[in-house]
Amino acid sequence: NTAKVPNASPTAASAGSDLNGMAAQAAAREIKRRMTAFAAEAHGVAPEAVRFRNGEVSVGDATMSFADLAKKCRQGRVQLSHAGFYKTPEIHWDRAARRGKPFLYYAYGAACAEVAIDSLTGENKVLRVDIRHDAGRSLNPALDIGQIEGGFIQGMGWLTTEELVFDARGRLATHAPSTYKIPVSSDAPKDFRVTLHDEPNRANAIHRSKAVGEPPLMLAISVYSALVDALHSIAPGRQVSLDAPATPERVLRAAEALKSA
């Protein structure tokens, strides 16, 4: 409700965790500072003697739950809300010179895809995919692996099935699920192996993590490349012409061209 709290940035550009995570961390640290100051004053100790660990707070020789301290802070009229703010540092770009640092860091990945094609129909199937993705120090490995799988499947659709077709009057003909084919669960490879390259991000991102939203989409280029390699087996040494998206029709045309060459 933006009438009550600041409006957040959109979840886009693979920057959701980077921006919102760092802003939330900044807010949490300020609230912790207030709670620490309150506890230290109440118990007559230095702020350095206040420790937060595993849901408990140690204040000198005393120990209490985090919930109890929060309750005491509220009763003591300590503000327990804060609006954190974060903007990506160290980025700049000179449009005229085309130089600068447009991104704080880069995410890397590698993928291998195995496909099978039917040279008589153009139908094809992705049999196996192996992915190694650089997620930095992953915030949630299970979620990150799911994001990588989803991004890769989306990329498969981009490169193999999702085709924009316009009629003679320039109107989009593939405008609905009945005409615009997106990947479904049965299109996912039966053997799908994803591992995370667990190495802390050198940039100061939230807990040294890295983006995993959109980067995996590009790894689906491995599927397109595997289709081209499969077509090469029809006529080794000959040039393969295959436009994307590599629909069954286009794979069939490429196969027929190789057979007749």
PLM regions with names:
Residues N1-A261:
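Cofactor-binding beta-sheet edge motifs in enzyme active sites
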